[in-house]
A protein has these predicted regions:
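Short, acidic, small-residue-rich periplasmic hinge/interaction motif at the N-terminus
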Residues: 110-138, 142-200, 234, 271, ...
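Short acidic/polar hinge/loop motifs at secondary-structure boundaries
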Residues: 198, 244-271
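Extracytoplasmic beta-strand/coil segments of soluble accessory domains associated
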Residues: 208-245
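A beta-strand signature from Gram-negative outer-membrane beta-barrel systems
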Residues: 214, 258-300, 304
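Surface-exposed extracellular loop regions of Gram-negative outer-membrane beta-barrel proteins
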Residues: 423, 467-472, 514, 533-582, ...
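Outer membrane beta-barrel strand-and-loop segments of large Gram-negative receptors
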Residues: 442, 483, 489-491, 576, ...
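Gram-negative outer-membrane beta-barrel transporters
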Residues: 499, 603-606, 628-723, 823
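C-terminal beta-signal and adjacent terminal beta-strands/loops
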Residues: 707-712, 719-743, 764, 770-826
Length: 826
């Protein structure tokens, strides 16, 4: 084994060296260095200002008259806003829109009270480039249309008539609309923290609920925030918090986000075609970045804090900024058990259930220089649930330490050391007890290289050590298993901008996992084509491997997964990782109608070597052997999924929202010769609608509010879908058992074909009737859950205490008009 591992590592090293030599041939750089200075009489001399790049979220502190510098990504539109830090609330804000044409450059600008002065960009002699800064209206021979017009600006006329030295008539919010290239990567959806807070119909701002609203993403029940993406299982989604794995980010009741939005920057979500940098999952990647605190304030220990009180939970957050250090910390706890006790006491409920959870989250960032940054984050979450005879507790810990260093204009280096923990206990009386503890230590490092025109290379190496301890006691069967695999990964990828309208991204990911002694290769490929200024087409495909899988005990919905790595059985059989081939395409069109964006996607995905779990009855001593590993009971299943998705959205104006439709089929088959079946998360069709109305507020509201920052909104979210699969039952019989001291009759229910039945269709409307407040100051909202009180099925079983056995269902959320939330910033 040691010789084999050495051979594999030598091969990986040669690959990395080869890629390094290949990309080191470069001579030109791709990023844009943006130098600026604020000279404006409306700001006080030496007043501290906050400069924010809205597209990237990058922010820095400066003062009037002091130069600042920031690195911008190439080939995109930027919005740069400058604000002061007036603690009275009378903030001044001035925003500029920049559009770059040409190749790489460094340019400078001075922001004044009446005009913007721009130096000529430094570009290669054979290439012409222009930088445009514009606000309310640029003075030129041809009029410049504002964003209220239905068509875009004629860029060629604008360049010919003013170019880089256009004069600004008034320094206000940007209203000029210019041509823009898509910034997001192929297969990626980007959701900002601000948009998550504005999501219609949510009782609390929720990262995962915002993802569930996307087409192709299935939420199986009200009681869980688990997601199923394009026919994949819940364990096939990779959750990353600052590059640390979070294994099972769920809270009971499904009303609360695991991650606190106050401490999160933008969320990146890949539901198809994620690049070679990400792996060990088959379906999707949800990447969250911890937010740096103090971006919108002067240097203070407690520059911004908030307290949030809702019907079931309370949350506190604070952030600050001193010198090169910035931080944000947040915590939350629930009192849902006390609320349920109160509801039971006054007769609103008859539910003997106790539940609680706690979350702690934070980020500390330190800038050693403009080129070197250290970032330490943490997330700790703990849950407990008691519902006699069921007892469960589980928790997640993720602690990543990352460093970023910009070596020069061509190279930048990233590294992360991460610790992740997931534990879970489940007991059902004295009949069953399952415990699992999973620890992982990971080291990740990667280099980005931009030294070749129109190429961005990324290559890196990862090493992860996992220790998983599993204990199970079920009737007469006892299993105790400890696994300690190492997982080595080397990858290389390139984003090649073939032309302004073609972006090709390709890569290769190499894996070696020690417990299963498995070497795997994952090729990835995607192509983005801009058909014209508003239309684009994305094509992607690839091969994906998953070395950490969940153990499924039932076909019906469960709250959590029990994770288990691929390994080697006691008889020497190597368990293969789950694998998948994915092929997908997506068409997008901005402004299909005025203000409406349209997307349509299709996909086909195969799945192989999926773990199935079944314990066979065995009266021998071997069934309780301490040498037994859990994988001895594994079988495998194969399957496929295919479908299409349609989406129409409107994000601006006095009303906003969207409608999504998806239709799909997912089929699996176990290798024991049984018939194909629908997996428990199969949802043939789903319709999702969200709608929000700005009744009163800023420029986009139906009525303008006299006081700046005030708003009053309402919103709703509707979902209609097929029910989840269930196994219907054919009948029952009496099993008579004669023991040494007793005689008993046991009713045994005879199941039919696996998942051949289906629950009733799902329908739910959530209404956020009141959403009122002042931006950055306070907010109050009132949400009604399940407005129509539709009875949605959650779990089905047969009560064998009655003859004949009675089919019994547990419902999901009823009509709940009590979701109140108040938030105050100080």
């Amino acid at each position: 084994m040691g010789k084999g591992l050495g051979t594999v590592m030598s091969f990986m090293l040669k690959i990395v060296v080869f890629v390094s030599m290949m990309v080191a041939l470069a001579a030109a750089h791709e990023r844009i260095i943006f130098n600026g200075i604020v000279q404006d009489d409306s700001f006080e001399a030496h007043e501290k200002l906050n400069v924010e790049i809205l597209e990237t979220g990058e922010a820095l502190q400066t003062t009037v008259g002091a130069p600042f510098s920031v690195v911008l990504p190439a080939d995109t539109l930027w919005n740069i806003c400058v604000t002061n830090s007036d603690t009275s609330g009378a903030e001044k804000e001035k925003c500029y829109e920049l559009l770059y044409f040409g190749n790489d450059s460094t340019f400078s600008k001075t922001l004044g009270p009446n005009e913007v002065t721009v130096d000529e960009p430094i570009v290669p002699a054979q290439v012409s480039g222009n930088v445009i800064l514009s606000e309310a209206q640029a003075e030129s021979k041809d009029p410049v249309k504002s964003s209220s017009d239905s068509s875009d600006v004629d860029v060629e006329k604008l360049l010919a008539s003013g170019g880089a030295n256009s004069k600004v008539t008034e320094l206000k919010k940007v209203v000029v609309q210019l041509r823009r290239r898509p910034k997001r990567k192929p297969g990626e959806s980007v959701v900002s923290a601000k948009s998550i807070k504005r999501m219609p119909g949510l009782a609390e701002a929720d990262v995962i609920k915002s993802i569930q609203a996307l087409p192709g993403v299935v939420a199986s029940s009200d009681f869980s925030s688990k997601i199923y993406v394009r026919g994949g299982a819940a364990d096939q989604n990779l959750f990353l918090f600052d590059n640390a794995v979070v294994y099972s980010p769920v809270h009971f009741f499904g009303l609360f986000s695991t991650f606190l939005v106050e401490g999160i920057d933008d969320v990146q979500f890949y539901k198809s075609g994620f690049p070679a940098q990400y792996g060990n999952r088959l379906s999707s990647v949800l990447k969250m970045e911890g937010r740096a605190g103090g971006q919108d304030s002067v240097e203070e220990w407690f520059s911004k804090s908030s307290i949030k009180i809702s019907t079931f939970a309370a949350q506190l957050h604070t952030e600050g900024h001193k010198g090169p250090a910035r931080w944000v910390f947040a915590g939350r706890t629930t009192y849902i058990g006390y609320i349920l006790d109160l509801c039971n006491a006054i007769g609103l409920l008859d539910l003997d259930l106790d539940s609680e959870f706690t979350d702690l989250q934070g980020t500390f960032m330190y800038d050693f220089s403009k080129d070197t940054r250290l970032k330490l984050s943490f997330y700790i979450g703990k849950d407990r649930l008691e519902y006699d005879p069921l007892y469960m507790d589980w928790g997640n810990t993720a602690i990543p330490l990352g460093i970023y260093h910009r070596i020069n204009d061509k190279w930048d280096y990233n590294a992360t050391l991460a610790f992740s923990e997931f534990y879970q206990t489940m007991k059902i009386g004295d009949f069953m007890s399952i415990k699992m503890e999973l620890y992982s230590f990971a080291g990740k490092q990667w280099l980005n290289y931009r030294g070749i025109d129109n190429h961005t290379f990324t290559f890196g190496y990862e090493l992860e050590y996992t220790r998983e301890r599993y204990q199970e006691q079920m009737a007469t069967i006892s299993v105790a298993d400890v696994e300690k695999p190492f997982h080595h990964v080397a990858y290389a990828q390139d984003a090649w901008k073939i032309s302004p309208d073609y972006l090709l991204q390709y890569g290769l990911r190499l894996n070696y996992q020690s417990a299963a002694q498995h070497f795997g290769v994952e090729p990835r490929l995607s192509l983005n084509v801009n058909l014209d200024e508003t239309k684009s087409l994305e094509l992607y495909g690839g091969y994906y491997l998953q070395y950490m899988n969940s153990i499924v005990y039932t076909d019906q919905e469960t709250l959590n997964e029990f994770y288990y790595p691929v390994t080697t059985t006691t008889d020497g059989r190597h368990i293969k990782p789950a694998s998948s081939w994915l092929f997908a395409a997506e068409y997008s069109q901005r402004d299909l109608f005025e203000g409406y964006d349209f997307t349509a996607g299709v996909y086909y995905k195969t799945q192989s070597n999926l773990n199935t779990f079944a314990v066979e009855s065995d009266s021998s001593d071997d069934s309780n052997s301490k040498n037994m590993v859990l994988a001895d009971n594994f079988g495998t299943a194969d399957g496929y999924s295919m479908g299409y998705e349609l989406s129409l959205r409107k994000d601006k104006g006095w009303w906003f929202g969207g409608i999504n439709w998806s239709q799909s089929i997912s089929v699996a088959r176990v290798d024991d010769g049984s018939k194909p079946y629908f997996p428990s998360w199969h949802q043939p069709y789903a319709l999702k609608l969200d709608l929000g109305i700005n009744w009163k507020g800023g420029e986009d509201a139906l009525w303008q509010h006299k006081k700046k920052g005030r708003y009053f909104r309402s919103s709703l979210a509707l979902k209609y879908s097929s029910g989840m699969p269930i196994s219907e039952y054919k009948g029952y019989y009496m099993a008579k058992e004669i023991g040494s001291q007793k005689y008993s009759d046991n009713i045994v229910v005879v199941p039919g074909s696996r998942n051949a039945g289906r629950q009733t269709d799902y329908f739910r409307i959530d209404l956020k009737a009141i959403d009122i407040g002042r931006e950055g100051k306070w907010n109050f909202s009132w949400t009604i859950i399940n407005l129509t009180d539709h009875d949605n099925m959650f779990f089905t079983f047969y009560d064998t205490r009655k003859t004949p056995p009675k089919k019994t269902s547990i419902s999901q959320f009823p009509f709940l008009p009590i979701m109140l939330n108040y938030e105050y910033y100080f």
